[in-house]
């Protein structure tokens, strides 16, 4: 795992077309902004897990 340190307003790039910007830090919460092409899905991990579980449930029905 790559670990990076960023300050508010700073960004990191993934490939040529995805950027993640730190928008705000308050206590133990970090607000980030993600710029990605429309064909790239961006989800919080817990939402992604629910989507995958629903897909698995549909495929076994």
Curated annotation (Swiss-Prot):
Say where the protein is mainly found: cytoplasm
Compartments (UniProt record): Cytoplasm
- The entry's protein name is Translational regulator CsrA
Might you report a single GO cellular component term?
A: cytosol
Top-level taxon: Bacteria
Taxonomic lineage: Bacteria, Pseudomonadati, Pseudomonadota, Gammaproteobacteria, Pasteurellales
Q: Which GO terms describe its molecular function?
A: mRNA 5'-UTR binding
Provide the alphabetized UniProt keywords.
Answer: Activator, Cytoplasm, Repressor, RNA-binding, Translation regulation
Instruction: List S-S links within the chain.
Output: none
Report the InterPro entries cross-referenced here.
CsrA, CsrA_sf
Query: What the protein does?
Result: A key translational regulator that binds mRNA to regulate translation initiation and/or mRNA stability. Mediates global changes in gene expression, shifting from rapid growth to stress survival by linking envelope stress, the stringent response and the catabolite repression systems. Usually binds in the 5'-UTR; binding at or near the Shine-Dalgarno sequence prevents ribosome-binding, repressing translation, binding elsewhere in the 5'-UTR can activate translation and/or stabilize the mRNA. Its function is antagonized by small RNA(s).
Q: Name one GO biological process term.
A: positive regulation of translational initiation
Q: Does the keyword Repressor apply?
A: yes
Of which family is this protein a member?
Belongs to the CsrA/RsmA family.
Partners and quaternary state?
Homodimer; the beta-strands of each monomer intercalate to form a hydrophobic core, while the alpha-helices form wings that extend away from the core.
Q: List the SUPFAM superfamilies.
A: CsrA-like (SSF117130)
């Amino acid at each position: 795992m790559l670990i990076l340190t960023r300050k508010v307003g700073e960004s990191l790039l993934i490939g040529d077309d995805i950027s993640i910007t730190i928008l705000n830090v308050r206590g133990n919460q970090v607000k980030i902004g993600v710029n990605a092409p429309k064909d790239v899905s961006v989800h919080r991990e817990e939402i992604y897990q629910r989507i995958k579980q629903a897909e698995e449930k549909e495929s076994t029905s």
